[in-house]
Amino acid sequence: MDLLTRIKGPRDLDRLSLGELDQLAQEIRTFLVDAVSKTGGHLGPNLGVVELTIALHRVFESPRDKVLWDTGHQSYVHKLLTGRQDFSRLKSKGGLSGYPSRAESDHDVIENSHASGVLGWADGMAKANEVLRKDDHVVAVIGDGALTGGMAWEALNNIAAAKDRPLVIVVNDNERSYAPTIGGLANHLATLRTTDGYERFLARGKDILERTPVVGRPLYETLHGAKKGLKDFIAPQGMFEDLGLKYVGPIDGHDIEALESALQRAKRFRGPVIVHCLTEKGRGYTPALEDEADRFHAVGKIHPDTGLPISTSGLDWTSVFGEEMVKLGEEREDIVAITAAMLQPVGLGKFEAAFPDRIYDVGIAEQHGAASAAGLATGGLHPVFAVYATFLNRAFDQVLMDVALHKCGVTFVLDRAGITGTDGASHNGMWDMSILQCVPTLRIAAPRDADQVRAQLREAVAVDDAPTVVRFSKGAVGPAVKAVGRAGGMDILRRPTAARPDVLIVSVGALAPMCLEIADLLDAQGISSTVVDPRWVKPVDEALAPLAERHRVVVTVEDNSRAGGVGSAVAQSLRDAGVDVPLRDFGIPPVFLDHASRGEVMAEIGLTAPDIARQVTGLVAKLDGRFESRAVEPARD
C-alpha cells in the first residue's frame, strides 16, 4: 500500500506515472477487498470503477469542479482519493458513510444513494454555472443500472436542449445494476447484432471465409469475436447522438491513459457530452466475478480469500416472504411478481426459478412498476410488487392515482421498513406508513413475526379490489410472538393484571417484543397494561376504540415517522369515536438519521423499552396527581 498511503488528496495523483497509476489501482482493489470484507458494504461496484475514478480526479479539479455520483455506493474509491482512508468503521456510527457525505468532505457534492437522479442535479448545476458565469466543470457519473430509471432520461431530454452548455456525463457501463441490467437500453446495445443487414453481412462473410483455405476459419472466428466491440462502438453512439449529445467512446474503463484522453476531450467540448466507459463489476476479485447473480453488489462480512460469509444470522424477514411467495405461486396461477432491479435483495430469486414467466423486472423504475402493476391487475392477475420501503416513496403518485383510484388488487411488499441503520438516511424505511395513510382504500399490514408475514401476505393477496401493503424489517426475524386473545381483527399479546388497566400499548410490527418488555417494566412499577397488535394498521380497527376506552392512557409504538404515522391515525380514530383518553405516540422524530446500527439509532432517538417505560410512568404519575411540578427559578444577573 506504498502508493495509496501517500495519496492525501486528488492532486497527489498528478505526480504519478502511468505505471505507478496501474500499481495504485491494484493497491486500491486489495485495500477494498480487505476493508469491506471486515465491515460489509458495496464491494462489486467499487472494484469496477477504480481506474475511472483515478482518471476523473486527474483530469478534473475537485472540489472546484463538481464530480457527482449517481447511486453513490460507487464512491468508495472517490473517498480514498480525497483523503478518507480509514475504512475500519465503514457504515458504523462515527465512521465513514457508505455513500457520499457533505459532512465528511467538500469533495462530496450530493448525498445521493437513490438511483437515476444525478443527471437532474447536473443539469441544474450546469445552468447555475451559466447564469453566474462560472467556468467550473460539472461531471455526472451514472451507471450500474441507473439509466433504466425514467428520471435519467427526463434529465437527458433537458440537457440535450442546450447545445452550448458544458456538462460531462460519464456512463459507467458494466451491464449490471444489482443483477444483469434489463430492458430496452440494454437491448439497444445489442441491436446491431440482430439487424437483418448485419446478420446477412455475417452470413456472407462466413460463407466466403470458410471456403478460403487454411486461414479462412480462424480468421472468421477472430472477426466473429470482434462483433461485440463493433456493436458497442456503433449502437450507443447512434442512440446518444440522436438525442443531440456529443458522444465519446466506448472507452476501456480499466485503461487509465485512454480514460484520461477521453475525459480531456470531453472537458474541452463546450456543450453536453457523453463519455461511454466499459467496466467490469467486481474486477480483480475472483469470488465477485464468479457470482453471476449480482457480482458481490453488496456484501456482509466475508472471508476475503473465498468471499464466503463469515456468519449467518438465521432466518430473515426477506427469506420468509420469498418462500411464502413460491407457495402462493403454486396455489394460484394469477399471482405474478414485480421487482425494480432487485430480484435477489427482495427475496424473489426462488419465485423466478419456479415461475420464470410470471416475474417482471422493470429496472430501476418504481413509478413504472406501480403503473404496470395496475395494468396487470386490470388484466386479471394479482401482482406482488416487492420493493424496499424507501424506494416506494418514488412511486406515490402511481400508487394513489393508478392503483388506488382504479381499485386495483395490487400488493406492495415493503422490505427494509423502519430503521435499517447502517445505510443511513436514504435507506431508512421510515416514511411509508405516513405517506400511505392518506391513500383511500389502501390497507397496511405490519406483521410482528415470521408466522404473521406468511398469514398477512395471504390476507393481502386475497384482496382484489384495493391496494394492500405488507411491510417488514431488515435482517433476522425473531421468535414467534403468540397472541393470547383477539379483539376484532387485532391480536392481544398481553392481558392486564388489573380490572381497570392503566395503559393500552398499541404495538406495530416487529416492535412487539419491545412492547412486551415495556409492559414488564411498567408492571414492576405497579402499572397494569394491555399490549395489542393491530396487525392491519390501516384502516384502524373499529375494535380499538372500545378497548382504549377501558384504559387510562393509550401508547402507540412504531418504527415510522411520528408525523402522520400510526399514532396519528389512532388518535384521529379515537377522536372520531368520541373516546377521550390521553394518547402518547412513540416513533421516529422528523429528522434524517445518520448511519449506525439499528440498536444505536433506536437508543439515540429514545425508541427503547426503558426510555418509553420511563416516559409512560411519568405520564401515569401525572394522571394520578403524583407529578411534582417544579417552579422555574428566575434568571440571575
Swiss-Prot record:
First-level EC class: transferase
GO CC list: cytosol
UniProt-listed GO biological process terms: 1-deoxy-D-xylulose 5-phosphate biosynthetic process; isopentenyl diphosphate biosynthetic process, methylerythritol 4-phosphate pathway; terpenoid biosynthetic process; thiamine biosynthetic process
Family statement: Belongs to the transketolase family. DXPS subfamily.
Keyword Metal-binding attributed: yes
Assembly with partners or alone: Homodimer.
Keyword Magnesium among record annotations: yes
Cofactor: Mg(2+); thiamine diphosphate
Reaction(s) catalysed (UniProt annotation): D-glyceraldehyde 3-phosphate + pyruvate + H(+) = 1-deoxy-D-xylulose 5-phosphate + CO2
Pathway it works in: Metabolic intermediate biosynthesis; 1-deoxy-D-xylulose 5-phosphate biosynthesis; 1-deoxy-D-xylulose 5-phosphate from D-glyceraldehyde 3-phosphate and pyruvate: step 1/1
Residues binding Mg(2+), per UniProt: 144, 174
Keyword list, A-Z: Isoprene biosynthesis, Magnesium, Metal-binding, Thiamine biosynthesis, Thiamine pyrophosphate, Transferase
GO molecular function annotation: 1-deoxy-D-xylulose-5-phosphate synthase activity; magnesium ion binding; thiamine pyrophosphate binding
Source organism superkingdom: Bacteria
Entry EC no(s): 2.2.1.7
InterPro entries recorded: Dxylulose-5-P_synthase, THDP-binding, Transketo_C/PFOR_II, Transketolase-like_Pyr-bd, Transketolase_BS, Transketolase_C, Transketolase_CS
Pfam families per UniProt: DXP_synthase_N, Transket_pyr, Transketolase_C
Transmembrane segments: none
Coiled-coil boundaries: none
Function: Catalyzes the acyloin condensation reaction between C atoms 2 and 3 of pyruvate and glyceraldehyde 3-phosphate to yield 1-deoxy-D-xylulose-5-phosphate (DXP).
Binding site for thiamine diphosphate: 73, 113-115, 145-146, 174, 285, 366
Cofactor-binding details, from the entry: Binds 1 Mg(2+) ion per subunit.
Protein name: 1-deoxy-D-xylulose-5-phosphate synthase
